[in-house]
Curated annotation (Swiss-Prot):
E.C. code: 2.7.7.108, 3.1.4.-
Catalysis: reaction(s): L-tyrosyl-[protein] + ATP = O-(5'-adenylyl)-L-tyrosyl-[protein] + diphosphate; L-threonyl-[protein] + ATP = 3-O-(5'-adenylyl)-L-threonyl-[protein] + diphosphate; 3-O-(5'-adenylyl)-L-threonyl-[protein] + H2O = L-threonyl-[protein] + AMP + H(+)
Site (Important for autoinhibition of adenylyltransferase activity): 255
Protein name: Protein adenylyltransferase Fic
Assembly with partners or alone: Homodimer.
Any one GO biological process: response to endoplasmic reticulum stress
GO MF annotation: an example: protein adenylylhydrolase activity
Motif (Inhibitory (S/T)XXXE(G/N) motif): 251-256
Binding-site positions, ATP: 255, 336-339, 387-394, 419-420, 427
Amino acid sequence: MPWEFLKKCDRQKAEVRGEKEEQEPVPGNPHFQVQFHVTSCRFAFLAFLAGSFLAFSLHALISSNLFWRLRQLHHLPTAHYLQTRDEFAVYSVDELNAFKEFYDKSTADSVGATYTEAEETNIKEALSSLRLAQDMYMAGKDDKAARLFEHALALAPRHPEVLLRYGEFLEHNQRNIVLADQYYFQALTINPSHSEALANRQRTADVVQTLDERRLASLDAKRAALSAIHEANSALRRAKKEAYFQHIYHSVGIEGNTMTLAQTRSILETRMAVDGKSIDEHNEILGMDLAMKYINASLVQKLEITIKDILELHRRVLGHVDPIEGGEFRRNQVYVGGHVPPGPGDLAVLMQRFEDWLNSEYSSSLHPVNYAALAHYKLVHIHPFIDGNGRTSRLLMNTLLMRAGYPPVIIPKQQRSKYYHFLKLANEGDIRPFVRFIADCTEKTLDLYLWATSDLPQQIPMLIQTETEAGEQLVKLQSPQMASIPESFYESGSGALP
C-alpha cells in the first residue's frame, strides 16, 4: 500500500532525528483537553495584547489630535504663541523659514486651491490686465500701467503672479520698496515655493529693515525731545488735555460711535447727556474715561501687566454699557469678519501665554512701538471678550507706550478701514504693515505734542471737523507747520526710498 508505506517512512525519519511522533489529539482525550486549555490561554493573552495595543493607539491618537489642535490653534506653535509673527516684527533672518513651517495654509492647499466660477473669471481678467499693464510699462506709459496693475490687484488680490508683478512695478518704477516687499511677502504666503518672489524678497528685506530701523530711531529722537519739555509747561498740559479728548473720541469712533469731538468733550467735562444720541454711545465714552483714569492711576506704574489687569481694564470699558460681561471672558464662539477667534474653552490657556509673553525677556528686548503694536494685535486676535476687544487692545497698547515714555497714540477714526486692513494682513501672516501703521500714528501724535509746545505764535493744535460732500466728518489740524508736511506722510506704509 503506497500510503501506508509513506507513513512508515515518515515515522522512521522522525525516529532517526530523535523526534517523537505526536499522537493526534482526539476530543475527550486528556491530552486534547490540556492542549485546548493551553491554546485558550494563548488566545486570551494575544487578545489582551491586541486590546492593550488598540487602547494605547487610540489614546495616542486622541492625545496627538489634542496636541496638534492646540499646536495649530491659530496656525501657530503651542510653545510660542504668535512667535512667528513676532519674528516678522523684529525682522528675524529666519522669518521665511518660520513662516513656511507655521503658516496656516499648506503649500498644497495654497497652490492647488480650487476657485468658483466667478473667481476664475476674475483671475482670467486680472491676468489679462496684468499683461496689458506690463506692455504699457514697457512702452513707457507708467500712469496707464499703474491703473491696470491696481485693477488686476483688485480683481485677484491673492494671486501670486499679480502680487509679484505689481511689487516689481512699485519697486522699480514707483521706488516704493516697502510696499513692494509687502507684496512679495504676500505672494510667498500664498505660494512659499515661488522662486521669483523669494529672490525679490531676499533682495528687498535688508533695505526695508534699514528703513524701518531708521523710522524707529526717528521716533526715539522725537520722544526724547518731548521728554525734555518740563511737565509744568502750560502748552504741554493743554495739549495733553486735548489729546485725552481726542483719544477717547477716535477710539469709540472706530467702533461706530457717532458722537462728534465737541460732544465727546462736553460729556466728559459736564457729564450732561447729548440730545439725539443713544445711551450706549454715552456709556461707551464714560467707560473709556474710567479705563483711561485706571491706566494713569495704576497700570503705568506697574512693572508687569497681568491677566487680572487686562480684565480690570475691560471691566471699566464695559462698566456702563454691559456691567455683567465687563471683566469676564466670553462664553460663546464669536466670528469677526473672516477671522474666527479661538473657542471659549481655549481662552484661559491663550491668555496665560499672552501674559507670559507680555512679561518675558524677549518682549522687553523689542522696541517699545513694536512691543505695543504686537501686544495690541495679539489681544485683538485672541478676542477674549464678547465686546470691547478693540478698545481694550488699544488701551493696552497705550499703557505699554506710556510706560516707555511715549504719549497715548491716537488712531484716527478716519483711518478705520486701513486699521482693519492691516489687522487682516497680520492674520494672513505679515504683522509688519500693522506695526508700521502704529508707528505712523505714533509719529503723528508726537508731532502734535511737539507742535503744541513749540515757540510758534499760533494757538495750540486744535482739531476741527469739516463736512465732506458725502457728509463724512474729517479731522484736520489748524497748523501751518503741519500743513507743510506732504500728504504722503500721513499715508500708512510711506516707505519710499529717498
